[in-house]
Amino acid sequence: MKAFTQHTGLVAPLDRANVDTDQIIPKQFLKSIKRTGFGPNLFDEWRYLDVGQPGQDCSARPLNTGFVLNLPRYQGASVLLARENFGCGSSREHAPWALDEYGFRTVIAPSFADIFFNNSFKNGLLPIILPEAEVDELFRQCESTEGYRLTVDLAAQTVTRPDGKALSFEIDPFRKHCLLNGLDDIGLTLRDADAIRVFEEKHRQASPWLFGAIK
C-alpha cells in the first residue's frame, strides 16, 4: 500500500450529499477483484452520457461536460471535496480502489458512511472529517478560485488552505501509523512473519499430532 505523509493537490468540489457507493462505482463493474482498472469508471453514470460496461474503451464515450471531473479547471485533481455521508450504501472496496486509481489521495467531507470510511484506510485513501462550516468555506473558496489547492499533512493532522490557515482533523492513532508507513492488513501481517514462523514451529513441536496429515 502507498504511504501517505504529506500531499498538496488540486481540489475538485463534488457538491452533492449522500453520494453512495453505487454512484462512486456502479455495480456492473464489480465483477473483478483486481484493484486496478476502475479509475475510468469512477462516477461512471455522472461522467458519461451512455451506460458503461466492463472492459469498454472509455476514451471514446460521450462525456457529460457539465460534471465537475470533466471540467478543464479540475483536470488532475487529487483532493476530493465532498458533502455529508459520503460513501453510503453497500460495502464495496471497489469504491476506494476507483477513487485511488483516478488519482485522489484524500477525500474531505463533514461525515462518511462507516464501511466506506474503514475501507478507505485499508486501501491507502485518507478520509478527512472536518466541521461542516469549514467544509462550506472550502467549497466557497474552491469554486471561486481556479487552481485551488490544499496541503494535507498527516503527521501534523492538518489541512492547510492557500491563505495559510491550517484546519485540524482527528484520526485514530493506529490508522495514522498504518497510512504513514504504507501498511495494509497484509503488510501488517508480513511485518510479523518471523514471529509467526517461530510460533508455528513451537506449536508443531508441542502438538505434533495436529500436523500429522500436513505435508
UniProtKB/Swiss-Prot annotation:
* Reactions it catalyzes: (2R,3S)-3-isopropylmalate = (2S)-2-isopropylmalate
Q: Which GO terms describe its cellular component?
A: 3-isopropylmalate dehydratase complex
Pathway listed:
Amino-acid biosynthesis; L-leucine biosynthesis; L-leucine from 3-methyl-2-oxobutanoate: step 2/4
InterPro entries assigned to the protein according to its UniProt record, in alphabetical order? 3-IsopropMal_deHydase_ssu (IPR004431), Aconitase/3IPM_dehydase_swvl (IPR015928), AconitaseA/IPMdHydase_ssu_swvl (IPR000573), IPMI_Swivel (IPR033940), LeuD (IPR050075)
Q: Which GO terms describe its biological process?
A: L-leucine biosynthetic process
GO terms assigned for molecular function? 3-isopropylmalate dehydratase activity
Gene3D superfamilies attached to this UniProt entry: Aconitase, domain 4 (3.20.19.10)
Q: Which UniProt keywords apply?
A: Amino-acid biosynthesis, Branched-chain amino acid biosynthesis, Leucine biosynthesis, Lyase
KW Cell cycle (keyword) present: no
The record's annotation in SUPFAM superfamilies points to: LeuD/IlvD-like
Quote the EC number: 4.2.1.33
Which pairs are disulfide-linked? none
Protein's UniProt keywords contain Lyase: yes
Top enzyme class of this protein?
Answer: lyase
Subunit record text: Heterodimer of LeuC and LeuD.
Task: State the family named in the UniProt similarity comment for this chain.
Answer: Belongs to the LeuD family. LeuD type 1 subfamily.
Q: What does this protein do?
A: Catalyzes the isomerization between 2-isopropylmalate and 3-isopropylmalate, via the formation of 2-isopropylmaleate.
NCBIfam families from the UniProt entry:
leuD, PRK01641.1
- The protein depicted here goes by the name 3-isopropylmalate dehydratase small subunit
Q: What is the species of this protein?
A: Azotobacter vinelandii
